[in-house]
């Protein structure tokens, strides 16, 4: 951006806004200090102080910008629309007279900043974008509308083209940043979409679907502060690496109260320590498990096999088989959840035993005397045991007999055997997997809380739920999320073309079938790829044409850039040749990205070898499985890289990725679409067929033309 004649005046306005922001922060800190000093008083006074303290703390959190810029632009309305000027920023700021200096980007008046186009200027005469670093104004970009409109050239259809490109070319930090200054029209439509119902956002790589969903959460909290602040907003991600990657976005937008979680976090009674084979994960995720678990719970409600004769004084109190069956039948009919019926069963057992006495006896007093008797304990354990979800699954999966009893009518015996695992000595010793989590949740829905157990809380529900990478979730995982929706309001985000794992879906209809249907689902699609350079997307599109031929690749904003590099390794060189090629490629990419980051994306089977090769070469790096991308160089298994963005990527062994992953071509497509700048492929021998150029191009020898992959000398 060249020097703009209004640069000094706009810098002065920005300085004034920051001064007012500092004044507001100082005022809030003084008020907080006064509240902290206050002690004693009535209960009402203490309550009021707590409310004030929470309110002030929330406001202080909003006023903390860190390194983020306060302002990023302004809009000037046409004289016929008032001729007003509004400065758009991260949060609302007023001067000492309460005159607005900055309008919150989520306010309705700010909408034209993101949505106005030449065809629909929305009453604007001019839109001005600021390029800033902190509080310093570096440049100004103007867009004129109406009779003053200019030809925008290559940026047509994009708001703030220069600012957008500058933001896209900024080096990655290992954390996802907000896009509040460069939100585009199609993104803003999704962000401001109404709260009720389910909104499905389909978006290819680099379209910004994740960050759009997070900005939508911030927008909904601003627009519907009451009731969402009390009801809560939940963001669910595919893994902890992904959560670490996105965790700073909402706080940077002044919304620190949103809960970020993986599915396992929603069940806090167990820890995930194992992984299921694909065929086991497929079965555990199938909706048929609803019937298996419901039958497993029903199977634990059984009449006595023989009459109970309980010694009591000089007589035996009797509960016969028929009476026990009546009690179980009545309890099944009366109670929706299993554990809720236990008290009724106890009372009925006490009543029948008391009625069998030759002398009158109070059932309540009798129960107090006999409830711990081993024969009574055994009878109740048979008729109606108190169960936790973990106990139910521990017993079920540890017994082939119980599995067949619960599932024989809906699951084949061969598949039931997949669920069996050796019984642990204790439920605390069970190695739970990610795919057990929705089954534990389903079991809790069937069992309910245990009486007088405070740790058995009711399922927490939320006023809005954002689900990222939803295309990979199983029916049982989706049921788990639906159970946490208070009112059916959800934002479901993903890309069918990137659907991988045991439950990869081929359409959003398959996903929506398991989510709340109080209102018809709305669908939006992001079609523009902002992050991935055109040459990288062109290579990835070859894979897409085979893995999901009905889907189109996003249209890349940046058509320039270095073509992907293909680093061929002689098959005779083996793993050592791969290691040398990876080290050479990483060094080349580090030289090209400066302070940016580099990720080596590989099959999980190569993770340790590649890390050892980098260590031997003296390249400091991290291995991202659970932790984030703090290192400049990181080795990431292909199954964990979805949703991340890096400056440069080295994709190792594309053939191995295709062969090892459940949806190999889709996994390779994910791997090829992570780089915002440079992409290198390290491969043994010939490239997989999916990466070969079309036959016509191969015959014409066009594979090495500009915009096509660059071949690197063979290694080995």
Residue ranges with predicted function:
Residues 175, 179, 209-213, 289, ...:
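Phosphate/oxyanion-binding active-site loops and adjacent basic polyanion-contact surfaces
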Residues 163-170, 424-425, 520-522:
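Short glycine/proline-rich turn/loop motifs
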Residues 74, 139, 391, 492, ...:
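A structural signal for short, well-ordered beta-strand segments and their strand-loop junctions
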Residues 94, 221-465, 472-480, 488-489, ...:
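Alpha-helical nucleic-acid-binding subdomain
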Residues 226, 230-231, 240-266, 271-281, ...:
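Conserved helicase motor core of SF1/SF2 NTP-dependent helicases
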Residues 184, 188, 192-195, 218, ...:
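Amphipathic, well-packed alpha-helical segments that form the structural scaffold of globular domains
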Residues 1-180, 184-189, 702, 706-716:
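Extended, charged low-complexity regulatory segments
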Residues 2-24, 65-68, 133, 150-152, ...:
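P-loop NTPase Walker
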